[in-house]
């Protein structure tokens, strides 16, 4: 999980949008999908956090990013997840690349009919893991439909991105993870 997280940071340690003019958006989405699948099997961030810390330092060194640190990489991952979940609110051009990757990866995912809504769900899990790493939260929570009623009145407030509240009506699982992310970062 730690290595996948370093790969889903397109502006720092991760797969870039382009390698020698080749569109790598599908590979970026593949990393996000893999992170979400691994997350579903993970209860604790130990030893993921240690692996992540070690690999971030290595990847930053390989790329000679001397002015970049772990927090910058986590923010890069978080911003990518936010941009997907808000359908381009942070960067519309990058969102178009993510959409291209989502469309192109459909033929490789056989467990479900992968869509933008699936990607938003996966991005919300990535955001939650990222926030957990930012706040040293080790215990991971997982969505189940039986806990949905207790979140019906939940609301994400400013200065966090309140557009995420729209997910409550369209993708409740994604809203759940964004709300848990909000709760973690609210006190950070």
Residue ranges and their predicted role:
Residues 1-111, 117-188:
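Catalytic cores of NTP-dependent nucleotidyl/adenyl transfer enzymes across multiple folds
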